[in-house]
A protein has these predicted regions:
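Alpha-helix N-cap/helix-initiation motif
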Residues: 43, 47, 51, 85, ...
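FAD/FMN-dependent oxidoreductases across multiple families
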Residues: 158-165, 174, 187-269, 283-294, ...
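Short coil/turn segments at secondary-structure boundaries
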Residues: 7-8, 143-145, 213-215, 305-312
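Active-site-proximal substrate-binding core of FAD-dependent oxidoreductases
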Residues: 251, 270-322
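C-terminal auxiliary extensions adjacent to catalytic cores
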Residues: 314-373
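N-terminal FAD cofactor-binding segment of flavoenzymes
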Residues: 1-28, 303
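Predominantly flavin-linked oxidoreductase catalytic cores and closely associated redox partners
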Residues: 52, 56-213, 250
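Helix-loop-beta segment of a Rossmann-like dinucleotide-binding subdomain
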Residues: 30-51, 182-185
Length: 373
């Protein structure tokens, strides 16, 4: 473990014991609810966190290990001697280093200035907006059917992103919930609503409104996230420099779960291991730092990025976010409607709704989904 005893000492919010996935239309929700007791081994469990609490704690751990932080300073440019990166420039100040690790987020201007990160493809990015809404621990436990320090993670497809590529999310914290949505950057230009309006409509959905009733808005934020998968991973190593985290495109949206922080941490660990080895060799050239790529290939980072490389193309299918949520809701509505008319066999009911999408489309999408996952 990078930080032994992390789950015991870190300011985590709740241990996730309930995972939900919902297909939403404007007026309905079809939900898959999975509940389990998390393992007794803390490092095998899943936790919710709030970055404004976790990040300062992480900074303290790094400082105790010998790192020095200079917060609130923007890096304006990279310092180079020939082809080698030798430091960073912040205003009039220059900080020199044997190796610079770029972790400047999904829109890595520093990586782009070196020619390592190519020009942006809008389909490789999504815009996320989030509200942190304060509730009492008792309200959270009652509304999400959890107890003690248990938590819930909930993903939504369909109406939250107005039928476009994206979806909603909800995570329970100790005394608040994190509620938001993401929408593909390439789709925003064609959207009928603005992203803030999508979030407001999401909050008013019949499945969401009771969960946040009486809550107090504590925080509002927006963030751009990578969605391109393996196809957007840039050149990771050059003379005196490496790229990690979102800047390297290390994020996986699998539909049923979203992974970003774990891949960012694992890539940073691989970079740190590489720097330590390079220092022992007194060699910070690109060929020496190429160990970083080998470390990534041996870790979960590149293995999972490679395994799920077809997911981004799957997520570009508009039927996943419009027609399929509607089809599932219509089938469930018909199954549970008693109107005095003879009931159809369920197979005929399903087939009738499936034909609206097209059996060929269903077959193609099913095969594509199976191969992607």
């Amino acid at each position: 473990a990078i930080i032994p005893g992390f789950a015991v000492s870190a300011p985590v919010e709740r241990k996730v014991t309930r995972e939900k996935i919902s297909f939403l239309t404007e007026e309905s929700a079809v939900t898959l609810d999975f509940h389990r007791e998390q393992p007794d081994v803390p490092q095998h469990a899943s936790y919710t966190v709030l970055r404004n609490r976790l990040d300062p704690w992480l900074m303290e751990q790094a400082e105790q290990a010998g790192a020095q932080f200079i917060p609130g300073v923007r890096v304006d440019a990279l310092v180079r001697e020939g082809n080698k990166v030798t430091g960073v420039q912040a205003g009039d100040d220059i900080l020199e280093a044997n190796v610079v690790i770029l972790a400047d987020g999904v829109n890595s201007m520093l990586g782009r200035s070196l020619g390592m990160v190519p020009a942006s493809d809008p389909h490789h990015y999504a815009v996320g907006v989030k509200e942190v809404i304060g509730l009492t621990p008792e309200q959270i436990n009652d509304r999400f059917n959890i107890t003690g320090e248990e938590g819930a993670a909930w993903l939504f497809a369909g109406s939250p992103s107005d039928g476009l590529m994206g979806g909603g999310f909800l995570y329970t914290n100790k005394d608040s919930i994190s509620l938001g949505l993401v929408c593909g950057l390439g789709d925003i230009a064609h959207a009928q609503k603005s992203v803030p309006q999508m979030l407001e409509d999401f909050k008013q959905h019949p499945a969401i409104r009771p969960l946040i009733s009486g809550g107090k808005l504590l925080e509002y934020s927006a963030h751009m996230v990578p969605e391109g998968g393996l196809a957007m991973v840039p050149q990771l190593v050059n003379e005196g420099v490496m790229i990690v985290g979102d800047a390297a495109g290390f994020c996986l949206n699998l539909g049923f779960t979203v992974r970003g922080m774990d891949l960012a941490i694992a890539s940073a660990q691989a970079a740190a291991t590489t720097v330590i080895a390079a220092k022992e060799r007194a060699d910070f050239s690109a060929s020496s730092l190429a160990q970083y790529k080998r470390e990534l290939e041996q870790s979960c980072v590149m293995r999972d990025m490679q395994h799920f490389r077809k997911i981004p193309a799957l997520m570009e299918n508009p039927r996943l976010f419009s027609q399929y949520p509607r089809m599932v809701a219509d089938i469930m509505n018909e199954m549970f409607t008693i109107d005095g008319k003879p009931n159809q066999p369920v197979r005929k009911m399903i087939m009738g709704h499936a034909k609206k999408i097209g059996l060929i489309n269903l077959l193609k999408d099913g095969i594509k989904g199976a191969t992607a996952l």
